[in-house]
């Protein structure tokens, strides 16, 4: 099950990157990892550094995708973001935290993207 979830996560992240590029976001990182954790996508648009958590679902059995971005997950994303900003010296950017929800059908042949801007704050 873990490999299946990882494959779905990778697929959803690729769909998200394609969506963001199509909407004129500049992708800086996909799957950025350090000793603190991971950020799915880091990008820039209109001089804003945007940190994106990607969540995909086949159904609502476990709730909406955005609901799985818990307070503790948000705090971890914020910690990793601060570390990334220091590492890359990106001090002159405002930062926004978004969530991209992807709703998949059972065959992965169609999907719907919901981009939630400013989904949470520091």
Swiss-Prot record:
InterPro entries from the UniProt entry: Restrct_endonuc-II-like (IPR011335), tRNA_endonuc-like_dom_sf (IPR011856), UPF0102_YraN-like (IPR003509)
PANTHER family linked to this entry: UPF0102 PROTEIN YRAN (PTHR34039:SF1)
GO molecular function: nucleic acid binding
Name of the featured protein: UPF0102 protein CLL_A1253
Originating organism: Clostridium botulinum (strain Eklund 17B / Type B)
Stated family: Belongs to the UPF0102 family.
